[in-house]
C-alpha cells in the first residue's frame, strides 16, 4: 500500500485562512478529495493521511467527515487544545472516531520557542498515549531544542517531525538544523516526514540537487524505517506539481535506500499511524 502521509483539505475562508498570503494566491480556493483523486490515481497513491491546517475542533470534525466518506483517506491528524484543562474529556470524545489517528498544533507559529515544553502543553501530550494518538511536530529549526526536550520526556509517545523541521534550503543553510535533527533522531519514538521540501527551496528555481544534502542528513539520522513520504498537497503546488514532488523523493530513495522504498512510501506511515488496510478496503 502506497501512502501519502501528509496532505490537506480546506474550504477556503479568507478570514480563517489568513496564513494563505497574497504570494500564495493560487491556494485561495477550495481543495477537497475530488481535487486530489486524479493526482492519487496518476501517481499510484492508495491512501493518504489528511492533516489539519486550522486550529479548531471544527477542523478536526471537517476532516473526519471527509475521511468517513472516502476510502482514500486512511487517517486524520486533527487538532485539539492540548493546553485545555478539559483535554482528557476531548480526547475521550475523539477516541470514538476510528479514522482519527493523531493531533498536531501549529507550533511553528508560536512566539514562544519553548511552547512545546510549556507545562500545560506537556500535560496534554501526556494524555495522548492512553488513547493511542500520535503527535505531529510542526516546527522551524529554531524550535528543535524544545522538540528534543519534549520527545525525550515522553519516550513511549509516537512523534513525527513534519517537513523535516523546515530546513533553510533556499539559503543553503544546514546548521544548526542538521545537528538538531541528528539529536532528535536518537529517540526511537520519533519519525520524520520527507515532505514540504520544495516550499522551503526557491519556489521558481529549485532543482533536485538542492534537496540532497538535507535528505542525506535525515536518512543517516533516522534510518529508512522511520522516514515517510508526504506530498504536502496542495501547499506543494506553490513550487511543484504533485508528480514532481513524489518523483523528487522517489528518485532519491531509489538511489540511496532502494530496498526500503516500500517502507518509506507506505509501510512506515501505516505502522506509525496504525492504518488498517482491511478497514479501508485497500491493498496491503
Regions found by a protein language model. Give the residues of each.
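Mid-to-C-terminal alpha-helical segments outside catalytic/metal-binding sites
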Residues: 1-3, 26-47, 217, 221-228, ...
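Conserved, mostly hydrophobic/aromatic
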Residues: 6, 48, 63, 76, ...
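Active-site gating/metal-coordination segments in enzymes
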Residues: 56-142, 149-151, 193-197, 204-205
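Divalent metal-dependent hydrolysis catalytic cores, especially in the metallo-beta-lactamase
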Residues: 21-29, 34-55, 73-81, 101-105, ...
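Catalytic metal-binding/acid-base residues of hydrolase active sites
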Residues: 8, 54, 165, 197-198, ...
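Catalytic pocket-lining loop regions of alpha/beta-barrel enzymes
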Residues: 115-228, 279-284
